């Protein structure tokens, strides 16, 4: 991923992990992400890597991830 809008990153993660990601914080609007995910990485480990550059908290409720 190179300069990919955060919303597109979330959409890709939704498809990869069969979850719904709800963005509750406007700070994500306009954010871009450059990085690489490896096959076999867990959703939680990917979210932790993203949190390094864009601090946020998240909750998991069954198949829904809420980003705050």
Task: Label the predicted regions.
Residues 1-68:
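A residue-level detector for the "anchor" residue at the start of short, highly conserved motifs
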């Amino acid at each position: 991923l190179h300069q990919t809008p955060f919303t597109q990153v979330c959409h890709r993660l939704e498809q990869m992990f069969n979850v719904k990601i709800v963005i509750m914080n406007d700070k994500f609007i306009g954010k871009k992400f450059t990085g690489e995910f490896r096959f076999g990485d867990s959703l939680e480990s990917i979210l932790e890597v993203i949190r390094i550059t864009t601090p946020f908290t998240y909750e998991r409720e069954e198949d829904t991830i809420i980003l705050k």
